């Protein structure tokens, strides 16, 4: 199944696809296409890719052989945390591989990618703030648990979309996912990194009852979704 998004988003919008039951996301802005933590898919199903972003070295986030195959097919850049960068040194050309740490940011054309910390038991995990050309702000939290700095980050960034882990990872639950949404206060929260719809529904119920200003979208894998920039007050 081809997972590429053929249509180009209009100004002030982005498209995304949930690629697997983990934190695999395909994100398309008006000019760039990014894949975050791609695993459990075939390289030939991802085309026209500008960059791969890796959050950490665990099997459900990094498949070095798959990253190598995708990179060869698309000639995309690869951004990765320190531990994943080591695993990718022999898989990706040095000119296409960039190590990234919390606090660092880079540009992929008009798209800005900033790495932030992650509360997860990996060697040097990161989360990513992705800002489109039109300043649509997406926060990919990998499978991080909540951490206090999220509140200030949410206030500063005014996120349009935050992905919230609700299962599978150590300590992760609908409640911990809700806490990420509560701290960051995005316009839209998407529960992911789970093998059950029940956990996503529990997250949605918590959001509805306690954070009514944040909408919830429960994604289906491989389906394309559109997200628009929040309205300024």
Q: Which residues are covered by each model-predicted region?
A:
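Active-site metal-binding motif and surrounding structural segment of the metallo-beta-lactamase
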Residues: 40-84, 156-163
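Catalytic metal-binding/acid-base residues of hydrolase active sites
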Residues: 58, 84, 119, 145, ...
């Amino acid at each position: 199944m081809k997972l590429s998004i053929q249509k180009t988003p209009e100004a002030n919008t982005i498209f995304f696809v949930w690629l697997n039951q983990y934190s695999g996301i395909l994100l398309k802005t008006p000019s760039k296409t990014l894949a975050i933590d791609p695993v459990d898919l075939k390289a030939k199903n991802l085309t026209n890719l500008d960059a791969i972003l890796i959050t950490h070295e665990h099997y459900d986030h990094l498949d070095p052989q798959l990253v190598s195959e995708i990179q060869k097919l698309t000639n995309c850049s690869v951004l990765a945390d320190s531990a994943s960068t080591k695993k990718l040194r022999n898989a990706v050309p040095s000119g296409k591989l960039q190590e990234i740490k919390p606090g660092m940011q880079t540009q992929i054309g008009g798209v800005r990618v900033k790495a932030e910390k992650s509360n997860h038991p990996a060697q040097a995990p990161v989360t990513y703030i992705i800002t489109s050309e039109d300043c649509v702000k997406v926060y990919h939290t990998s499978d991080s648990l909540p951490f206090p700095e999220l509140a200030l980050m949410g206030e500063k960034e005014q996120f349009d979309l935050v992905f919230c882990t609700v299962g599978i990872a150590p300590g992760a639950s609908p409640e911990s996912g809700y806490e990420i949404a509560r701290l960051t206060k995005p316009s839209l929260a998407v529960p992911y990194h789970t093998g059950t719809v029940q956990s996503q529904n529990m997250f949605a119920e918590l959001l509805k009852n306690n954070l009514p200003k944040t909408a919830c979208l429960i994604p289906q894998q491989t389906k394309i979704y559109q997200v628009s920039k929040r309205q300024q007050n």
